[in-house]
């Protein structure tokens, strides 16, 4: 039985996706037989994310519109289609080392908690340097993701929405920091590791997100909006 689905968004990251697939294939049978991977292209204008056999089930979806910073919708789609009890939600520029993945799959943890990871940065010379934990990488059960409500797609188009999701995580679960780490890949190592198409922390983010929050508050007993964007399946491979 497969235990975990690794979920990450894609946006014009062909080189980084190839590196992800290379690292996943290298896990070995003991990990791959428990793993599935879902990639969601959140509207890349330069072509679709390309799939290939990676040794475990791989599914790729693509959102049909190109919206600034729409990785929240991508994560919702991935979680919706996952069939494993556990999810690992992260970004495409974060690699899960074999030791971390083996520890995740080989350890029974309370399903009532949500888990975060330490982080290292991959340097150009291959060394790893300590880096602050990623604020939007999560290990949790699919059932708990549903209870939290997933990501609220009202905030589509804004950078920094991970804080809103984290606030709701704190309302439903204890967050536990694990000693294992993820590896951040900067653009100095892989040029398309992360997007340069859209700016981060723009004025529209500072002013727009509070307006969405205020409008949402008027709804009273609101629930997060999910699966609001059209999408299609691009690729599926059993292994």
Model-identified regions with their sequence ranges:
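Glycine-rich, basic loop-to-helix element that forms the pyrophosphate-binding segment
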Residues: 65-81
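Short, well-formed alpha-helical segments that are part of the catalytic scaffolds
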Residues: 13-28
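Acidic donor-binding segment of Leloir-type glycosyltransferases
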Residues: 24-65
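Donor nucleotide-sugar recognition loop
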Residues: 149-167
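C-terminal catalytic/acceptor-binding lobe
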Residues: 19-20, 163-239
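Short aromatic/hydrophobic "clamp" motif used to bind/position activated sugar donors
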Residues: 87
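Short beta-strand-to-loop element that shapes/binds the nucleotide-sugar donor at the catalytic cleft/hinge
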Residues: 115-129
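Acidic donor-binding/catalytic loop of UDP-sugar-dependent glycosyltransferases
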Residues: 92-107
